[in-house]
Amino acid sequence: MTFISNIQSVAKYESKLLIRSWFFRVFTVLAVTIITFFNFQLFVSEDSGGFWIATAIPSNIPYLILLLLNTGQAVIAIFLASDFLKRDKKLDTSEVFYVRPLSNAEYVIGKIWGNLRVFLLLNLIIMAITAAFNLTLGEVDWMAYLLYFLLISVPTLIFIIGLAIFLMLVLKNQALTFVLLLGYIGLTVFYIEDKLYYLFDYMAYSLPLVKSSIVGFSNWEVILNHRGIYFLAGLAFVFFTISLFRRLPNSSHSNYPWLVISFCTLMLAFVCGYWHIHSILYQSDIRATYTKINNQYVSTPKMFIHEYDLSVEQHPEDFLSEVTVKGVALDSSAVFTFCLNPGLTIHSVHSAGQQLKFKRDKQIVLVDFGTKHAKGDTISATFRYDGQIDNSFCYLDIPPEVLQASNKKFLFNIDKQYSFQTKNYLMLTPETYWYPRAGTSYSDKNPDWQQTYFSNYRLKVKPLPGLVPLSQGEGKCDEEGVYSFKGDYPSQTLSLVIGDYQQKSAYADSILYSVWHLRDHDYFTASFDSIHDTIPWLIRNVKEQLARQYKLDYPFKRFSIVEVPVQFASYERAWSQAQETVQPEMVLFPEKGAIFWELDVKRQVKNHIRWSGNNEISLQEAQMRTFSNFAWMFLQTEGDYNFSSGSRGRGNLSSTANPYFLFPQIYNFRYNIYSSEWPVANRAIELYLQKKSENEGWERQINGLSNNEKANLLLEKHTFKELLADVEQRNLQNNIVGLEASRLFARSEINMGV
């Protein structure tokens, strides 16, 4: 018999024995029953609360199901895989193979393949059941079923089966093997979790695996490398098992090649593990380098740019841009400092038709204008560059532990990205420094880098065929497919999003309100069919409520909610409450609002009718309530609330800032206060206007202390500056700054009789 046919013969025999096992049969029945019931609740039952993050993004359905199945089969595989060695020895179940001229490799691989293929068949059955239910939604991501099967189930099964059999041969004790492996599983799931950058997460619980319906996976290299660790380690244990197997080999030297192969495979697994850690640590190192370079150039001469002319041409793999800046010299010099994302390559810089010399130091661009310009002189320069954005340059002020913290919604682990660039999608926000800006980015030595100015922006964009660009200002398209944008007012920054967008819009008080969604992502229009004429009135109420509360009016002629990939992440800064999710005139909202249960609008309308009880409400009223709940999200200062167990059985409540809070639209994008001595001056004004230091009595009832009381206690023990630099107090930073702002303005309020 050939090598393959021998393996198939052994595998066939082993598979039959495994299928006849009552242990496996019980697990199969339980798995099928539980998964079927879960799918029924998810797709069919109207009494369930809904699970919008799973159904909004079709790829999340196989992700969730296989993750749940993976937990059970990883435990069961330990018992069943290690059992065949005990069974062979105790019951002589494989004597028929021992007398045949089989190599140890054929026998061991056949045994393991026999176990593995039964589990893989169970996975296929579970996926088929899930896909059948999934078809009721009308939107199935078939590729996601295959990818998650290969990324979650296959590496886990190969690793745990190979490790179990290897330990059985080494320890020669099944009970001890069970104890060690079950302890290992418990340790990785409940204690280690995502520690050490989720290196030990062999079941893929902490690995960011959410696949966007817009850009797909945003961290392919991390995923393949991480799953490769356990796939290769599992193969290495299988090869070690062949060389250690207690059976006379066909040749006295036949074990040596397998030892060499096993060591080489194990080394490859270690290399993948090393690369996983190294790539993450490299991000921290390069970020420190970028900050160090900013510190070096933060005090060099720069200019105030009051006019930008930008031209962007989208390519499948990158983008080409030509930017002309015009401004005023703030210092007397011939060389001025600019900052541009280090992933972008500058091809030329010229002014008035003359090529200018420039020096590039990572993100810093030093442009030599040839002659010295006096302070106040008008200067212009044109930059031509292309490339891809380096995301590691973003958020240099955010501590590594915050950047590396998991972004988890239930069991769904979402990657965090700050820009996107694929053949069908492009998203660039100001944080990426996708166009040259005067001075440097974040410096931890000198706050002068924070000083920003309002500039006039004109933007021309040539997208790929069939795609629509979005930016600040009204977009106009010419006959050649080039879009032009010009803002109504000077702005501090500019953003650009290009995708296969469609628009739903309504006018209210001469302002154009729009929802820009990706093609085939309009799941909400039908749920508001009874209130199309009422929506402008509801929007007007939200706008007026925002103006009444903060005594500031919305200044722009447009407001858009733009659908972006779910992996897009932002952070609150020490000097401003504005996050990248909120841009002038627009909010960048996760695809289909997947992370918010309020966005399951179809179910929400039904729930409002069902929950009305004796006070029956009309379909129109239910739709109005659903719309109002959605709009309310943009008026809340807090985002997620997290409940945890405290000491002596008390609960503990913590909250994070709402990244979609609209306050920056009426304050940050129209006003800016800067002080080199008080870098948080602008933040203090924000929080003073919001009266952040008030209205938290209900938190005291849960925590025993409100966040303001906690902040007061901290201010008694530490200085204001120390608390701003303390990463552990980030959740209380608003309260700390708000209390200081209230104290700062208290005397003025008394003098004015406020």
Give a label for each model feature.
Residues I61-R87, L122, V323, F383:
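Long, hydrophobic alpha-helical segments
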Residues F23, F27, Q73, L102-F133:
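Selective transmembrane-helix segments that form parts of the transport pathway or gating/packing helices
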Residues S332-V335, P342-N407, K445-D448, E480, ...:
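A surface-exposed beta-strand-loop module
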Residues F24-F40, T265-V271, N446-F663, N672-R730:
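Hydrophobic helix-coil surface modules that form long, contiguous segments used
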Residues L42-I57, Q174-H253, W275-K292:
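Terminal transmembrane helical anchor/hairpin motif
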Residues R384-Y501:
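Extended, low-hydrophobicity, Ser/Thr/Pro/Gly-biased non-transmembrane segments
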Residues L199-P208, G216-N225, H253-F319, H347, ...:
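N-terminal, polar/Ser/Thr-rich
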Residues R20-S45, L67-A77, L180-V189:
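Hydrophobic alpha-helical transmembrane segments of multi-pass membrane transport/permease proteins
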